[in-house]
Amino acid sequence: MPQSRTHSRTATKHIFVSGGVASSLGKGLTASSLGQLLTARGMRVTMQKLDPYLNVDPGTMNPFQHGEVFVTDDGAETDLDVGHYERFLDRDLSGQANVTTGQVYSTVIAKERRGEYLGDTVQVIPHITDEIKSRILAMSGPDLQGHQPDVVITEIGGTVGDIESQPFLEAARQVRHDVGRDNVFFLHVSLVPYLAPSGELKTKPTQHSVAALRNIGIQPDALILRCDREVPPALKNKIALMCDVDVDGCISTPDAPSIYDIPKVLHSEGLDAYVVRQLGLPFRDVDWTVWGNLLERVHQPRETVRIALVGKYVDLPDAYLSVTEALRAGGFANRSKVEISWVPSDACETEAGAQAALGDVDGVLIPGGFGIRGIEGKLGAIRYARHRKIPLLGLCLGLQCVVIEAARSVGLDDANSAEFEPETTHPVISTMADQEDVIAGEADLGGTMRLGAYPAVLTKGSVVARAYGSEEVSERHRHRYEVNNAYRDRIAKSGLRFSGTSPDGHLVEFVEYPADQHPFFVATQAHPELKSRPTRPHPLFAAFVDAALKHKLEERLPVDVHGEERAAVATDDELADSADRDEVASVDSAG
């Protein structure tokens, strides 16, 4: 006779977030917002994403298919939802926060090859599901500081019914059995579509989605009803009855004004209080001090600033998700709204193209990327911003392009990166020594870049040191190429300063033009956007947006005491002289 199981109500609680009917309903933001609410109630929350694709990680996936790759401090290449988790929880997560089918199968097959299964026939159940469970339960262990989480929120990627998601859902069902029903909460995100011709909200898709979930042994405790409008009480009652969920657990979530309003929406519907009651968590009121201040800055900006994001993947904004969130957070730091102008880098290859694309912006951001496509356009945008004193921030590839443009401006006409032109006579950007076997095709491409957090030392009094308020910083990285130190002296003749390096001085981490040459022209080999939080904006982005605001204010026409406008722009002769200088510089740097 099997023994009865007893479970402690004080154990770490597990919340599983699944999705149904359609993808892109906002499971990640829902999970992040619930995590934020529980954190604001004084609980220690950690989060995890289970991705059903067979890739080991998203590091080699096409940005147009997957969006950005979010890098953690420990060097894991993870799903972009992990970025949402870090931003909403305001805490760093490890590579454990992202589990893929590829990782699970790789581990299980490796164990089989080592003979760890003692001759068993290896199957999806129990071997694959056991490996998934071990990774879920590992999140409930102490963190690096020795703190055990009160709650683990696990988002299950895909939708119910996907064949790829079934092992993860089965593992989640087994976790409930293993740790006790009182310690597990299932939250299901479903679509309630509105049919305009009939003027009705339809509940059948949600009913079918919940039925599919129940077929595999999971009864949801609460439903997130996604719709473009409020779900009326009568419909909530119907869904509660047909899906066997408490009415208090039917949460209407219409589209919010901003993603930062989602916690307020969930709280107003009582989701966090319902979860606390169901899991027996200690009840504390939500402390809105920090998040309320954020919402005030989101909805009551004093200024608006326009930033051009000159990128290669602008057709899919998710490819730059952390960059755009960091820009917006930089705006919050300055009580300003950042409007992003999405500029395909190809559009800036010519002076006329750059003028058309960048003529009305207050700042230019050059993000990371790979490959030669669009590089000349990035160089054109950099040249345009340098000549016209428009604030610029370069990230990763952005730094490399800034260095190439500076080198070309001092006579190294064919200066280039070994990534784009392996045979260039002036490889001002070269392959890192430990990456040469990868470039030669003699090692794996995935997971082999310089990944994770690395320290840097900043030059005292530099623009970046003033922005950070420190001369020692740590930032996350993801790259294979570096500034070629053999060209540092020649590049410095352009006025560009190498204002931050690795502690040993070998690897260039930051470059800038001094403040007396340009109001703000900074680039970094790192990805500082990955450490920005809406409630704690990254200092580089805050300084960049501040410079863009000052640039905007300087462009305005002041009014004298008699009410007459005084021209705050150059005279026609001065503009003509400037255009001549720009044309000469453009021809000189184009080679």
Curated annotation (Swiss-Prot):
Binding positions for CTP per the UniProt entry: 23, 162-164, 202-207, 238
Family the entry assigns: Belongs to the CTP synthase family.
Binding site for UTP: 23, 202-207, 238
Organism expressing this protein natively: Rhodococcus jostii (strain RHA1)
Name of the gene: pyrG
One GO process term, biological-process aspect: 'de novo' CTP biosynthetic process
Entry binding sites for ATP: 24-29, 81
Subunit details: Homotetramer.
Pathway the protein takes part in: Pyrimidine metabolism; CTP biosynthesis via de novo pathway; CTP from UDP: step 2/2
Reactions the enzyme catalyzes: UTP + L-glutamine + ATP + H2O = CTP + L-glutamate + ADP + phosphate + 2 H(+); L-glutamine + H2O = L-glutamate + NH4(+); UTP + NH4(+) + ATP = CTP + ADP + phosphate + 2 H(+)
Protein name per UniProt: CTP synthase
Residue numbers binding L-glutamine: 369, 397-400, 419, 480
Location of the active site: 396, 527, 529
Keyword flag Cytoplasm: no
GO cellular component terms, A-Z: cytosol
Residue intervals of the Glutamine amidotransferase type-1 domain: 306-554
Superkingdom of origin: Bacteria
Regulation of activity: Allosterically activated by GTP, when glutamine is the substrate; GTP has no effect on the reaction when ammonia is the substrate. The allosteric effector GTP functions by stabilizing the protein conformation that binds the tetrahedral intermediate(s) formed during glutamine hydrolysis. Inhibited by the product CTP, via allosteric rather than competitive inhibition.
Function statement: Catalyzes the ATP-dependent amination of UTP to CTP with either L-glutamine or ammonia as the source of nitrogen. Regulates intracellular CTP levels through interactions with the four ribonucleotide triphosphates.
CDD domains named in the record: CTPS_N, GATase1_CTP_Synthase
Record's keyword terms, sorted: ATP-binding, Glutamine amidotransferase, Ligase, Magnesium, Metal-binding, Nucleotide-binding, Pyrimidine biosynthesis
Pfam families, sorted: CTP_synth_N (PF06418), GATase (PF00117)
Record-linked PROSITE patterns: GATASE_TYPE_1 (PS51273)
Entry EC no(s): 6.3.4.2
Amidoligase domain: region residues: 1-281
Keyword set includes Ligase: yes
Molecular function, one GO term: CTP synthase activity
UniProt-annotated binding residues for Mg(2+): 81, 155
